[in-house]
């Protein structure tokens, strides 16, 4: 019975998010790192606030909803290619990457300019 439930959940997530490829995996990884970075920065600044933490989770859920919308658009318009979903993933990867670098910078870590520029270029495409 548990196997059937797990299989149904896998099928449902595959339908909602499309193929589990590199852009989607990088986006999810970046969102987790950004969320954890926000928590670390808030702890260092002694301004840890559960309301802000919940807003971070709401932001992640909202991004995932946008990904689902882009997958459904691809299913409707592109019939098997992930154009909208990949574009959306790249956009949010750039946003999350910039946020991660900003979080590290707040902790006093120097940032490679080329990496920041590449993320900004990706965001503006």
UniProtKB/Swiss-Prot annotation:
Swiss-Prot/TrEMBL keywords: Cell membrane, Membrane, Transmembrane, Transmembrane helix
Alphabetical list of InterPro entries matching this protein: Phage_holin_4_1
Subcellular compartments: Cell membrane
GO annotation, cellular component aspect: plasma membrane
UniProt topology in membrane: Multi-pass membrane protein
Name of this protein: Uncharacterized protein CA_C1842
Pfam families: Phage_holin_4_1 (PF05105)
Family: Belongs to the bacteriophage holin family. Cp-1 holin subfamily.
Domain of life: Bacteria
Transmembrane domains' residue ranges: 22-44, 54-73
Keyword Transmembrane helix: yes
Main location: membrane
């Amino acid at each position: 019975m548990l196997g059937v439930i797990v299989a149904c959940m896998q099928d449902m997530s595959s339908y909602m998010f499309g193929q589990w490829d590199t852009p989607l995996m990088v986006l999810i990884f970046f969102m987790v790192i950004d969320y954890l970075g926000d928590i670390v920065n808030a702890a260092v600044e002694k301004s840890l606030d559960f309301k802000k933490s919940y807003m971070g989770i709401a932001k992640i859920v909202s991004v995932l909803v946008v990904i689902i919308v882009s997958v459904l658009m691809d299913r409707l318009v592109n019939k098997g290619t992930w154009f909208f979903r990949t574009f959306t993933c790249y956009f949010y990867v750039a946003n999350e990457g910039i946020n991660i670098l900003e979080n590290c910078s707040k902790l006093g870590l120097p940032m490679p300019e080329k990496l920041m520029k590449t993320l900004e270029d990706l965001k503006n495409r």
